[in-house]
A protein has these predicted regions:
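A short, N-terminal "cap"/entry segment at the start of jelly-roll beta-barrel domains
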Residues: 1-35, 51, 117-132
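A short beta-strand-loop-beta hairpin characteristic of the jelly-roll/cupin
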Residues: 47-49, 56-82, 89-92, 97
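Short, charged/polar surface micro-motifs in flexible loops or helix N-caps
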Residues: 28-31, 40-46, 68, 112-116
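A structure-centric signal for secondary-structure junctions around beta-strands
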Residues: 32-34, 58, 103-104
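Conserved short histidine dyad/triad with adjacent acidic residue
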Residues: 36-56
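Conserved hydrophobic/aromatic beta-strand scaffold that supports enzyme active sites
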Residues: 22, 35-39, 61, 77, ...
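Ligand-binding loop in jelly-roll beta-barrel domains
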Residues: 70, 90-116
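Short polar/acidic secondary-structure junctions
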Residues: 26-29, 85, 99
Length: 132
């Protein structure tokens, strides 16, 4: 049976460096997918950037709804703008940072109903360059 999910029903996650709303996941009945709406604010002077994270068991597909940013990954740096999509393979450390003057809005998809298993995320930068 099809189901409708609204942004108002989304679970707010307390993740460092961004606002993240989990709209669809195993917690609300999904069997094999998680979808999040993520807003990365414009960095403030002196603010410590968040560190890279990884998802060991699954890919992450990120679609840019609005704004400008860069995804720093073990395989390289990828500039992003509205309409771009980046696919991160399982286990690759990565972080997306806002490089624009307005919030960076992303839609993130994972082929798993529970992405907490295998996700490792430190609080601050470790290993990738600061980008402001």
């Amino acid at each position: 049976m099809a189901r409708l999910f609204t942004q108002a029903q989304a679970k707010q996650l307390g993740l460092p460096g961004r606002k993240s709303l989990e709209i669809v996941s195993g917690e609300n009945g999904a069997k094999g997918v998680t979808m999040r709406l993520v807003e990365i604010p414009v960095p403030q002077p002196g603010e410590a950037p968040r560190g890279p994270h990884q998802h060991s068991g699954h890919e992450e597909c990120i679609y840019v709804l609005s704004g400008y940013g860069t995804t720093f990954a073990e395989s390289g740096e990828y500039p992003l703008k509205a309409g771009d999509t980046i696919l991160i393979p399982p286990g690759e450390k990565h972080v997306t940072r806002n490089t624009g003057h307005m919030p960076l809005l992303l839609l993130c998809f994972f082929p798993s109903a529970d992405i907490t298993k295998g996700t490792v995320e430190p609080a601050v930068s470790s290993g990738f360059p600061k980008r402001q």
